[in-house]
Regions:
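C-terminal substrate-binding/cap subdomain adjacent to the FAD-binding core in PCMH-type
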Residues: 1-106
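Conserved glycine-rich FAD pyrophosphate-binding loop
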Residues: 77-216
Length: 216
């Protein structure tokens, strides 16, 4: 968790215009979840088990090569196991991230949580390997799957995230979902919070513009 949080921090502070960064952890050993990570992200250089962090850089070949060299030094990538996707691998990979394909066939609840980047470590520490989730926006956007008939866990997650200056909405409800708090409706206040959080670490909208709402 500390390594991923540190990598996100370095990515956010990089001057090399990284346009996206996401972390996909190991799936929890729980039969209530669909174990599909390996299938969803099966590419030539990603056909292996385990969690991984992915980042995207865009531009012409010379620019990409130069920035990739700089980023490799910034993140100390020589000490980590890495793979590089070509254009025809990268496009479908990020499409799968944006389309939430990890949760495509789930009948469970799916939550969306937005938190300040500095709180990423705390949220990861809360979720650990108990939930199926992934992180986007270099640590500020969490997509969390919570099993059906476990509304109390949704409440616990929501309370913790709100205490850490974030908010939660539900984007997919399970058949037996029975949670009625207004926290799960999108309103102007949450939109403003989302904008403020994203602008704090992405003032020029490099990270997946339009990912959350048209404006952000």
């Amino acid at each position: 968790i500390k390594i991923i949080s540190s990598l996100f921090d370095k990515i956010l502070s990089s001057s090399n215009e990284i346009s996206a960064a996401a972390y996909i952890p190991d799936e929890p050993k729980n039969k209530k979840y669909d174990f599909n990570k390996s299938k969803v992200f099966k590419f030539n250089d990603l056909d292996r088990e385990g969690s991984f962090l992915a980042f995207r850089i865009e531009g012409d070949q010379i620019s990409i090569k130069e920035r990739l060299n700089d980023i490799s030094k910034e993140l100390n990538l020589s000490k980590l196991k890495t793979s590089k996707l070509d254009f025809f691998q990268s496009v479908p990979f990020w499409k799968k991230i944006n389309n939430l394909e990890l949760f495509a066939n789930t009948k469970n609840n799916v939550l969306r949580a937005i938190v300040p980047p500095a709180k990423c470590f705390k949220i990861m520490n809360l979720l650990k390997n108990k939930f199926k989730y992934f992180i986007d926006w270099s640590g500020s956007l969490f997509w969390i799957e919570v099993p059906d008939k476990e509304d109390i866990k949704i409440s616990e997650i929501k309370d913790f995230i709100v205490k850490n200056n974030g908010f939660v909405t539900i984007v997919k409800k399970s058949e037996n979902f029975d949670f009625v708090e207004k926290i799960f409706t999108s309103d102007e206040t949450k939109l403003l919070i989302s904008k403020k959080i994203k602008e704090s670490f992405d003032p020029v909208s490099l990270f997946n513009p339009g990912r959350m709402y048209r404006e952000i």
